[in-house]
């Protein structure tokens, strides 16, 4: 009793043919910078639908359904685009063709776009098109120490949860183009899969970072957690220093040269 929860659901806008829609964020969906319920994630083609905080599960799902239906009808009426249902992305163009989300010319809008430019340089734009659901929740009367105990337990059993509930066993060949993989081609189609895979999204081909794997983040308490992230946010990382903050033309490559540009990158 007393639990409050909210959902953030990401999804790619796609053409009826299954390819990524390269059109700007639809005007009919409002401003991606300021709309409280509908925004974009990494790409201009990647919608993020947001609910408020709810005490009841059904109320939360009902709001998400209403927002989802509004977006679906808006896309249908303004060009016939669809929302891709899977976590692993649809057919993608070349990496540099995937459009970054745009938020206008204000300082905060430009910072958000530069941050995404940095993500593209660091991890590749294709990886950033992986979509998912963020389930946000809070318990009444729970201390920071108790939250960290819960985090440690979740991380301890995460492999079992992915095995039981993972739902990304296949992907489009374009996602791993030019990369070494051991995936098999599905009979009668072009999709790649592994027979007993449950979550390619969370495997080595999915949403992973070798650079962040070097982070020694402490989950023993708030102070240790904050200190370990502070170092990642302030200490220069050689590979990102070599990339530089600006390119020769003066445009920004990234927000900074540390392992994490901002906290959200972790």
Annotated model-derived regions:
Residues 1-120, 127-129, 146-152, 156-162, ...:
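Terminal catalytic/cofactor-binding subdomain
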Residues 101-106, 110-122, 138-266:
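Loop-rich catalytic cores of soluble enzymes, especially ATP-dependent carboxylate-amine ligases
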